[in-house]
Amino acid sequence: FTTGSCAAAAAKAAAYMLLSGMEKTEITIETPKGIPYTAQITDIQRKECAVTCAVIKDGGDDPDVTTGSRIVARVSLPEEQPDSGEKRTQAEILIDGGSGVGRVTKPGLDQPVGNAAINHVPREMITKEVLEVCHLLDYQGILQVEISVPGGEELAQQTFNPRLGIVGGISILGTSGIVEPMSNQAILDT
């Protein structure tokens, strides 16, 4: 499964644990291809207003430098929930990259300059899965999701990222949610 699938699964699990107070050691998401992915959840750290957990990336037979990496999600409540005066009908999910996730420095990529290198499909997956938890647990406030990859800065040196203008880490990628071995599309998406 892609780094995007791993990020979405970790974010969903962290959101569930934060909002429910219950621990999750596995979680299932639906990939954009409609294939369910059940991920094992590791490295759970709980605080009053945040939960951090990880999913270990399994790239299958694809020679992917991220295979075996921990894709970490930290889901937190903002220090203050802004009051816009209107009642929310659903939660708002704010996504950013942390340590080991690259930042876009050149125009023409999937994300604008300055954004974390978390492509639009993984962003949509994370949002969909976290909103599903919010709906299930009747939460309509703001949640902050930060995706990080320990060792991502070093891994990025083995990718096209430095040449593409993505600095500081790897990209969180995926269009189908499934690693498609040695595909031309995977190279273009990078």
Predicted regions and their residues:
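Glycine-rich anion/phosphate-binding loop at the beta-strand->alpha-helix junction
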Residues: P150, E154, P162-T190
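Generic N-terminal targeting/processing segments that precede catalytic cores or assembly contacts
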Residues: F1-L164
